[in-house]
Amino acid sequence: MLDVTWEWIAIDKAALDVANTVVVEKGVEHDLLASDPAYQRWAAAAARSSELMPVETAALASAQAPIVEVRKHIRALFHATAAGEPLPKAAVARLNKASRAAPQWPELGTNHQIEQIAIGDAVDRLLARYARSAMEIAADGRAKLRVCGAPSCGMFYRPRRDPQRWCSEPCGNRARFARHYRAHRRTSSRSRMRT
């Protein structure tokens, strides 16, 4: 069992956070939302890290199956986007459907504030939020979405600078260490062969 603490890569892009609930450890993918207790921990953390309304927070706690299903399409969309490939038709269709299920528009209040109005049930609004977030990321294009190149990571991230190849410093450190280890191992095996 993986020991998980939720690290939010992009608070402003909820789709990245839901997509990154599938992690790679020693070359094996692990679904961090597969068990109900793990999903409930993630849902509680997701509710705290975003601007969910109370009704959406309650909906999140009971939306494991639809979240996991939409996540599958978000991940397919992100893999294609990061690779510069055409977007999968099934993923586009499912995310468009999720977005349409909860129409949203801004309205100006008498207090000079703009309020976002959304219709549809709370689960539909939640799925629409993730779908729209994924659409925005995919529309930004390949240069703005990458898959971490560190060993045993594979998380999606948006680089803060152009040459960035890892989602975080710890991943960069692991990648550099692995590269150094491989180079050192090759050098030492060559010197043993000569003697």
Question: Predicted segments — roles?
Answer:
Residues D162-G172:
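Cysteine-rich micro-motifs
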Residues C153-R158, G172, R176:
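Short functional micro-motifs and their immediate structural scaffolds
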Residues D17, A175-A178:
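Alpha-helical elements of the RecA-like P-loop NTPase motor core of helicases
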Residues M1-V147, P151, M155-F156, R190-T195:
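Short helix-coil boundary/hinge micro-motifs
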Residues R179-T195:
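Contiguous alpha-helical segments
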Residues A44, R100, G172, R182-R185:
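A generic structural signal for secondary-structure junctions
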